[in-house]
Regions:
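Charged, terminal alpha-helix-loop-beta segments
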Residues: 1-212
Length: 212
């Protein structure tokens, strides 16, 4: 569905563009902007690391690692491409690799991230507890699940088929489309969660709760 500009005398469709054409790079632009505005693709999420890669025998890095209000870890992978590449496969690996993270490890990772972005005196542990609404750490409740958010300009049929298959098997994974438009000298981005559709996600939650 196109996006339109309502002008004084007419309604004009905006011109679709690509992140490449408007010279927005994946890491230095898209990732940097979303890191400080993470609610655009992952509401109620606290970013605790960027380019996270604290594991042995692997040079892989998670674009953005966060935590949600339910103390679930959130792996966020970004692509500016028109098909999403193989980002779902990368994200599954990352989710498995961080699934054993403890609260203390997360607090340490968060502290290093805060120092890197110019907030070395912020108490990472206290801020993490405050975000979760906890008085003290609860390791039994921490990181009981890992959610995956894939954000890309577009997604291939292969990728969306894989994501739907994973959802059917209980994996919390979603696709958020970032479609850029050009308007004069500005770049506008239409952000839409396309899988699962928000209405379907709410329905699935209700069905799951009913089964319990």
């Amino acid at each position: 569905m196109p996006i339109y500009e309502f002008a004084s005398e007419e309604i004009r469709p905006l011109n679709k563009t690509t992140f490449g054409l408007v010279q927005l790079k994946e890491r230095t632009d898209l990732q940097r902007l979303l890191r400080v505005n993470i609610s655009v693709v992952a509401p109620d999420t606290l970013v605790i690391a960027e380019e996270f890669g604290d594991w042995d025998e692997s040079r892989r890095r998670i674009d953005i690692l966060g935590i949600d209000r339910d103390a679930n870890l959130v792996v966020i992978e970004l692509k500016r491409t028109e098909d999403g590449g193989h980002m779902e496969l990368q994200a599954i690996r990352y989710a498995a690799m961080v699934s054993t993270m403890t609260f203390d490890q997360a607090a340490d990772v968060f502290a290093r991230f805060l120092a890197r972005i110019g907030k070395p005196h912020t108490d990472a542990r206290a801020e993490l507890l405050d975000f979760l609404g906890w008085d003290e750490p609860d390791e039994d409740a921490f990181a009981q699940d890992v959610r995956i958010v894939l954000a890309s300009a577009e997604f291939s049929r292969e990728l969306t088929t894989s994501v739907l298959w994973l959802i059917e098997r209980g994996i919390d994974i979603r696709c958020v489309r970032l479609q850029p438009y050009s308007l004069d000298s500005r770049v506008l981005v239409d952000v839409q969660q396309i899988i699962p559709l928000p209405e379907m996600a709410e329905y699935q939650i209700r069905v799951t709760e009913k089964k319990r």
